């Protein structure tokens, strides 16, 4: 089971949604992408590894019961480009929300204003 704070995951989900679904005209895509990259880069290595594993559980590459295996693979794949890997992942927000849901968690009630 992930130990990564779900509030951090929901913050990333909100930013990823802004990037995926369009932004207000005064919030260009490159700025949204840079902000999302920065949020992920501020996570420590353990948190980045868990975020990748959570994505993989969310997209059903791994089942929740295979969490330790997903973590092990994510740990082995971790690099200085992990943030870029995540931001480049299609449907990042959906993968993260799906991962949270598979562990009985979610982002309902999360306020985008908490960013």
Tell me what each language-model feature is.
Residues 57-69:
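Short helix-capping/linker segments at secondary-structure and domain boundaries
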Residues 74-115:
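Helix-rich interaction surfaces within compact, conserved domain-sized segments
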Residues 2-27:
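Short terminal alpha-helical segments
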Residues 49-59:
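Short, hydrophobic/amphipathic alpha-helical patches that form generic packing surfaces
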Residues 8, 47-51, 66, 95:
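Residue-level detector of well-ordered alpha-helical segments, enriched
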Residues 39-48, 90-91:
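Structural motif
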Residues 24-42:
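Short amphipathic alpha-helical segments and their helix-coil junctions
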């Amino acid at each position: 089971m992930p130990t990564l704070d779900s509030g951090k995951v929901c913050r990333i989900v909100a930013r990823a949604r802004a990037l995926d679904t369009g932004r207000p005209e005064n919030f260009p895509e490159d700025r949204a992408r840079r902000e999302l990259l920065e949020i992920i880069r501020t996570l420590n290595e353990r948190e980045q590894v868990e975020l990748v594993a959570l994505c993989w559980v969310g997209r059903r590459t791994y089942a929740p019961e295979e969490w330790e295996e997903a973590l092990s693979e994510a740990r082995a794949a971790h690099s200085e480009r992990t943030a870029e890997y995540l931001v480049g992942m299609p449907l990042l927000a959906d993968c993260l929300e799906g991962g949270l849901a598979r562990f009985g968690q979610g982002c309902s009630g999360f306020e985008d204003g908490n960013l």
